[in-house]
């Protein structure tokens, strides 16, 4: 059946002499793998359209019994990044695309996830600073959409507020992934839970990202130590909930160059 949908390019792999296997995240079908014939022909109709992160209108011949669908047409809606892009932009882009590819299943449509991905990529593309903050925003929001929301507002052991006003200055928090949130370190120790210690700066940052609109994220500047801590914090939570999650190759590559 011929189907049309909006799609974002997640990954491309050469196939044969002229073709590519392309992974998309689509508005209508979720993650989808397609065969694009003749893509590598410089005079072909797909030339330069299917670049990583591009926003497309896609036409495909979809057959539910096939794992790889045949792509018949792709029209560019908006390109992603350009020759003047910074390393931090490229890092945020590739990590966002890799995360969605590794944490979602084929043919599992989720409009909320698509709209989050689309909005995040747009902001990475046009914003002038703090691009990695958009990736962290994406992670925090994606966690909720995938069904394992983090509780940032109350201690998961005592119910006490973790808001900036309520949290004592000398208080420390730990991540208790098995409880779906954070706990006061003292309360965790009293109950025999070790948890993952989280600095005040890292906790405040991810808590703030869970509450704000994406338009505000560009203003969040993070020190390198806090950036690396948030990487570890959110990575740990994803891996607790998603079995056999592979290592993020884009993070290994870009973080050595940027952070």
Swiss-Prot record:
Describe the task this protein carries out.
Involved in DNA repair and RecF pathway recombination.
Membrane-spanning ranges: none
Give Gene Ontology CC terms.
bacterial nucleoid
Organism of origin is Chloroherpeton thalassium (strain ATCC 35110 / GB-78)
One Pfam family of this chain: RecO_C
| UniProt KW Nuclease keyword | no
Cross-referenced InterPro entries, in alphabetical order? ARFGAP/RecO, DNA_rep/recomb_RecO_N, NA-bd_OB-fold, RecO, RecO_C
UniProt keyword annotations, A-Z: DNA damage, DNA recombination, DNA repair
The record's comment on protein family reads: Belongs to the RecO family.
Name of the protein described by the UniProt record: DNA repair protein RecO
What Gene3D superfamilies is this protein classified in? Nucleic acid-binding proteins (2.40.50.140), Recombination protein O, C-terminal domain (1.20.1440.120)
GO BP terms, alphabetized: DNA recombination; double-strand break repair
State if NADP is listed as a keyword: no
